[in-house]
Amino acid sequence: MGRIWSVGGAVGLVLVLATAAMAGAPTEQVRMYTDHVQRILDDPTLKSADKREAVRKVAEQVFDVNETAKRALGPHWQKRTPSEQEEFVHLFADLLERTYIAKIDLYGGEKLQYTNEVIDGNYAVVRAKVLTRQRAEVPVEAKLLRRGDRWLIYDITIENVSLVGNYRSQFDRIIRTSSYQELVRRLKVKRDEFLPPQREARPARS
């Protein structure tokens, strides 16, 4: 996916950022839940598996995976049937969990400093900086969409690399050089490699 996604602290903060809740000032909501998730990551009494499960439960409530999946598929989304769209959202949710939540052990105690926010109707952008232990500053941007009385994150950008944009370019390349069916096949292979035999793919939150 690109260099930034493999940086341990950035991965941890991506997960921390993927937490917003009741509508209000987006930054204050992100800040409140950032503290919650950061306490989970910093808790020495929790095992890695327990931390992953705790973070997953928080993140799945506040990350608009349906919107993210739709944007990641780009122009190919409208060409899919409703059942295909539903299947893709499920597969994409598993991909996000495998890529990020499974790697929270890489989190190294980095801190988050908020810089500003922009609200435009039902959309908002919260900008921050990840402060690493090496005193480097990594710019982070969370894009949120208001759904009823909640702000939900649908994209995260780190050092100008967008999660949605990154996946969209990968998915588009596979579809154009092969087919949509090949993309689904690859996602299923990745999912099956990740999921233990006793676990079934988790339906995406509607």
What are these regions (language model features)?
Residues 1-6:
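Positively charged n-region of N-terminal signal peptides that target proteins for export
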Residues 94-95, 132, 159-163:
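Solvent-exposed loop/turn segments at secondary-structure junctions
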Residues 18-25:
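Bacterial Sec-dependent signal peptides at the C-terminal "C-region" and cleavage site
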Residues 137-165:
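Short beta-strand edge/turn micro-motifs at domain boundaries
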Residues 155-206:
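Low-complexity, intrinsically disordered terminal/linker segments enriched in charged
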Residues 8-18:
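Bacterial N-terminal signal peptides
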Residues 97-138, 190-206:
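Surface-exposed, charged secondary-structure patches
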Residues 25-100:
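Early exported N-terminus immediately downstream of N-terminal targeting peptides
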